[in-house]
Amino acid sequence: MKVATLLGERFKKAPADCVFDSQALMVRGGYIKSVGTGLFSFFMPAKRIAKKIENIIREEMDRIDGQEVMFPVVMPGSLWQESGRYTSIGSELLRFKDRNGIDMVLGMTHEEAAVQLARDAAKSYTQYPFMIYQIQTKFRDEPRSRGGLIRTREFTMKDAYSFHTSQEDLEQYYAKAYHAYDRIFARAGVPQVVAVKSDSGMMGGRVSHEFMLLTDIGEDTIVICPECGYRSNSEAADCIVHNEEYPIEPLEEVYTPDQKTIEDVCNFLHKSPLQSCKAVLYQRNMDDSLVIVFLRGDLEVNETKLRNLLCAEMHAATVTPEMGVCAGFIGPKGLPEGITVVYDESLKTLNSFVAGANKENYHYKGMNMARDLGEVKYDSVAKATAGGICPVCGKHSITISRGIEVGNIFQLGTKYTESMNMQYLDSDNTLKYPIMGCYGIGVGRLIASVCEVSHDDYGPIWPITIAPWQVQVCALRVADENVRRVADKVYEDLKKAGVEVIYDDRNISAGVMFSDADLLGVPLRIVVSPKTLERNAIEFASRDKSFKADLNPDNVVAEVKAKIAEMIAALTPED
């Protein structure tokens, strides 16, 4: 391949709407082109990277006995009606009717298709366990596509589905898949990806992990304990806080004119937000019924946990007179009947605190939950905070980081096999529902994530295992016959030896050539110039500037192949 005929223009500057480094560099470098919101075409370099990542994934899935299959992108709505997700998933699932008026969907995941494929093919316990997987296009109508390939609407994903006859067997396979993911990310050049406990969301199941690339630009919040290694997505993390023991005070109603926020009322009463209770109001989407969450004044509601607790989608409440509550002065004592009330565990040991009195311009101080409200049920619905207590080791060591989710794994249980009536005949001659696991990796997002953590000011620095080419040959002052002869020979020799090589033989300045080479991010570079040939050598260097050497033009292939093997070995994990 020659740079002169490589489609895709390279730019000095990125468009103003690029929000992440990876997005800017991939646009500047001629990797991707936007077609519409969250929709991208791939030029050759990006496609080659994607194919290499897919091959790594394929090798690791085959290594744990995966069977590669292919599902359709378009599925009948009736299939999703079987599982219940046709109505339970919102507008991110793209629905349409075909010419015959039949409801159809564009697949955003393929659990339904996997069960439909397997339920008529795996009727006996002797066929279990098994795992099927595909690497294929998905469409999710994201409301906030952004960041280039970080969050798109159409994307390529590896999705795998395993089927088991026991929970123990699922857990054993889940561990294998977990290890396979570690190998995939290590081989792709991002061993810093970590697994975190996660919320299963619409996928269902009780056990799930997300694989996160820790980076400041990540959209996900990660809760980490550096003391014991506990890691969780904030959506699934428990918030455990310590409450000070305050002197017991009598319950007293106090006048707090126009003090409607926690900050206002605490300043007015000379109290800390840690000694206060705040109310956060929601309404259920289905009927607009009111939900009030009470938690310690310095904390925030974990809306994922709240949604899971109440099994309902919700939105921020719009308070109306008919609700019977006093906005800005709402508290747990004296609420009207018929309101769903959730008490966070942060209030369980809090005493002598400030709370709304459910009366215009009044608050209580000196409130005590047990004394003033009696026995109530507490739930964990607050977001974990930095400095909080680790749920595993019990130390005040929680830190908060950001991350990009590049993969996920779930123990689904029988959610889909039961709803879609997939059964097998067990050894005791009874019909049972298989237990499922599912395992996903976003290919495009992984490309962008690698670029996000492996670049400099000049362009991407692709790991050797996924780079679009392994070596770039640059011929400087190609009009020089000696330069042309040597550079052409090096290029042809490397090609014949099976090295993936791209050749820049354009008659351009060294500055432009090296700038384009940096944007292509090829990990190894050979420079042939009159200056190097004066010393009967060519320059051999790495894109990351970790090494640089002169090579004898007659011994290029052996040296280059040895270096490639060394770099690949450095990214290959031990079994």
Regions found by a protein language model. Name each.
Residues 1-98, 156, 161-201, 298-299:
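TRNA-binding/sensing appendages of the translation machinery
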Residues 38-43, 156-165, 210-212, 406, ...:
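Short, hydrophobic beta-strand segments
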Residues 111-116, 144-158, 168-439, 443:
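Extended, low-hydrophobicity, polar/charged segments
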Residues 265, 437-466, 470, 565:
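C-terminal, non-catalytic macromolecule-binding modules
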Residues 491-559:
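C-terminal structured "cap/appendage" subdomains that terminate the fold
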